[in-house]
Amino acid sequence: MNRIETAFKNTKPFIGYLTGGDGGFDYSVACAHALIRGGVDILEIGFPFSDPVADGPIIQKAHTRALEEKTDSTTILEIAKALRETSNIPLVLFSYYNPLLQKGPQYLHQLKAAGFDAVLIVDLPIPQHANESEPFFQALIEAKLFPIVLATPSTREERLLQIRKLAKGFLYYVSQKGTTGIRSKLSDDFSTQIARLRCYFQIPIVAGFGIANRASAAAALKHADGIVVGSAFVEKLEKKISPEELTTFAQSIDPRQ
């Protein structure tokens, strides 16, 4: 059983996101460990990219900081290896399509060997029949990496049916329109949208984009099978808070405690 499947067996996972290399290698690894101590059950590691169009200003700046630290594909592998020395937490690579397309299928096998369990491509086209992304899904399967796929409030039925054939581990529901960022509350149709998705999917449905405090996390977990917190953590890294402070902050968001 994949580590991601195991994470959903007895709880609704708290998923955290950090941009790999933000603040440098050592700080990035220390902050990842801090989130694990703070109760995060699954960790998403962002592959820094020069044009992160799906992200809001907070995470865009994190991509810039990571690139300024010379973070590259090898750095991402080394971060995973460092975490695997002491932790069995499921790891998801959160990336744009272009960096992985340039690296080729062999890099997916390197990700698996380093300790990653899944890959989420934020801008990957979903194949209708045969198009440029279909070989990539096959390459993920061959590398034994789960493809994590996004759905939004505007995703139409025909696309959901295609996603259902491809997604493994969990479905990532983008609960807010627009880019990543901190929101004060969930959208008014959140519960309705989750119910709609359950008509199509048997895998867990996780909500992300905008969840930044205990109240919104608790509200999301009433309907979703897990939550993702990203921008709220990344904003703390921009301020260079200590790993100990990050652990405390993560605990303050987790409504299960």
From Swiss-Prot:
Its EC number is 4.2.1.20. The keyword Lipoprotein does not apply. It catalyses: (1S,2R)-1-C-(indol-3-yl)glycerol 3-phosphate + L-serine = D-glyceraldehyde 3-phosphate + L-tryptophan + H2O. It comes from the Bacteria. Transmembrane segments: none annotated. The keyword Nucleotidyltransferase does not apply. InterPro entries: Aldolase_TIM (IPR013785), RibuloseP-bd_barrel (IPR011060), Trp_synthase_alpha_AS (IPR018204), Trp_synthase_suA (IPR002028). One of its GO terms (molecular function) is tryptophan synthase activity. Pathway: Amino-acid biosynthesis; L-tryptophan biosynthesis; L-tryptophan from chorismate: step 5/5. The active site is at E44 (proton acceptor), D55 (proton acceptor). GO terms for cellular component: cytosol. Gene3D superfamilies: Aldolase class I. The alpha subunit is responsible for the aldol cleavage of indoleglycerol phosphate to indole and glyceraldehyde 3-phosphate. Belongs to the TrpA family. This is Tryptophan synthase alpha chain. It comes from Chlamydia caviae (strain ATCC VR-813 / DSM 19441 / 03DC25 / GPIC). The lineage of its organism: Bacteria, Pseudomonadati, Chlamydiota, Chlamydiia, Chlamydiales. The gene is trpA.
